[in-house]
Amino acid sequence: HTTKHYNGWAGENPRGYTTWNGIHSWIDGGLAAKAGIRLEPLLPRVPPAIVISLAPREDRRDPMFVAVFDYLRRQHTMVEPLYVMEKEGKLGQAAGARVHDEARAFVEQRMLDGGRMLSAIWLTAWRGAVPDTYLRAALVRRQAGAAKTAP
């Protein structure tokens, strides 16, 4: 999603990777469905969410920005291995082809890594959020109104 190769190899292509613009949808849906990737078997591999430290950095860069871009850089290193697997026929998109175990494991790990990062962002935001006094006040008013109309 964050490289120019998100939907087929773009630009110079000395290794002859696919330029098929359906690779994105295949990875996000077709491969997972064909390989039978499901949530339940992955759950034991899901670690607890962690809070991203928002402590000021010596370099004065925003800690959340750094955490997100570090994650993206790590994921970018996975782009070429994916295209190598496609070139080797391991993604199972051809009629009658199977999804190889290597490709299944690769996609499962990308899902787990993405979930780990999303959970860290969510937990960090939730823990750092101020109390929602507006909604609490609305709930108190609604409960008070309901109490007045009760028999």
PLM regions and their residue ranges:
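Active-site- or binding-pocket-proximal scaffold segments within functional domains
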Residues: T3-P151
